[in-house]
């Protein structure tokens, strides 16, 4: 009996220790980031449901076509979370070169066997899945850049060739992306890479050369392609040709104008009824403005930029703990998400020419949604490892 009592008396302590361990691991995850992301996912799903029914019925004679695919993507993201949240960041640092090579191979393959939509070869079809290599290219580039800076940060600061090496990788990817063509992703890659190199302490003179060459290249690319010239001219004054090159932008502006401050109400958009092209993907923000108004649009942008600033904060904390790869990866994710959001919103409001970029976490698109989710998993894992390192630095005293 005494033996049984002793055995049973130890069990509660073991159970308590197990509970405390699991609970502490949960606390070590950034719960604010989790809830913000889940909130955006919910808004994105609701808006895809609202915007995709008309076009699903018209093209596929099934009003739930895009909705079913979106739900499948969320289920896939849920499964991927078990892998990425449990994988140490050091794994991605060690294999960053392999991931980069895979993404470049995919960029080559999409030009050879890719599926064309609106004249752009951006998708590889594998069964019912449509893989967009340009989305994979973003996260692979930032993993490579962070890995390079963790090894060669002094070389980047003191040597032009150390600065130019990561830029040469981006240039190689950009040439393949422009062949699709996908100028929007090229702009995002260049801006994010230059911003992260600036954070690493690279000299201003090095940026001057790269930025000058980049601007001249973009101008040349616009002048060489007639459709890009038309895009720039239609963005400059879309009302000059409202039923031609300026059609999409004028319909987008009409949607935003109809929304006013409070919006027409969820599901009450008129522009999504086959007036505004890509209402469920690149131009979903216009329908958000129409249905939820300026206030709803502002709140959604506030959440996205809060996530971006949170990423920068996580990166700063990691760098303070000498976790160089983690720090630069988190910073690159924050810059990428905020810059891509700015370009998307600028395009649908007529501030910038259209670039074919999605609104992160909101627009329909499996590759975009999955890659954005993986970026969040990276942030959560980086924050987890940083907090774990901090907690281990302060050992508990004897009980």
UniProtKB/Swiss-Prot annotation:
Keywords: Cell cycle, Cell division, Cell inner membrane, Cell membrane, Cell shape, Cell wall biogenesis/degradation, Glycosyltransferase, Membrane, Peptidoglycan synthesis, Transferase, Transmembrane, Transmembrane helix. It is a multi-pass membrane protein. GO terms for cellular component: cell division site; plasma membrane. One of its GO terms (biological process) is cell wall organization. Pathway: Cell wall biogenesis; peptidoglycan biosynthesis. One of its GO terms (molecular function) is lipid-linked peptidoglycan transporter activity. It catalyses: [GlcNAc-(1->4)-Mur2Ac(oyl-L-Ala-gamma-D-Glu-L-Lys-D-Ala-D-Ala)](n)-di-trans,octa-cis-undecaprenyl diphosphate + beta-D-GlcNAc-(1->4)-Mur2Ac(oyl-L-Ala-gamma-D-Glu-L-Lys-D-Ala-D-Ala)-di-trans,octa-cis-undecaprenyl diphosphate = [GlcNAc-(1->4)-Mur2Ac(oyl-L-Ala-gamma-D-Glu-L-Lys-D-Ala-D-Ala)](n+1)-di-trans,octa-cis-undecaprenyl diphosphate + di-trans,octa-cis-undecaprenyl diphosphate + H(+). Its EC number is 2.4.99.28. The chain crosses the membrane at residues 33-53, 71-91, 98-118, 160-180, 182-202, 204-224, 287-307, 324-344, 359-379. It is found in: Cell inner membrane. Pfam families: FTSW_RODA_SPOVE. It is an enzyme of class 2 (transferase). Belongs to the SEDS family. FtsW subfamily. HAMAP family: PGT_FtsW_proteobact. Peptidoglycan polymerase that is essential for cell division. This is Probable peptidoglycan glycosyltransferase FtsW. It comes from Buchnera aphidicola subsp. Acyrthosiphon pisum (strain APS) (Acyrthosiphon pisum symbiotic bacterium). The lineage of its organism: Bacteria, Pseudomonadati, Pseudomonadota, Gammaproteobacteria, Enterobacterales.
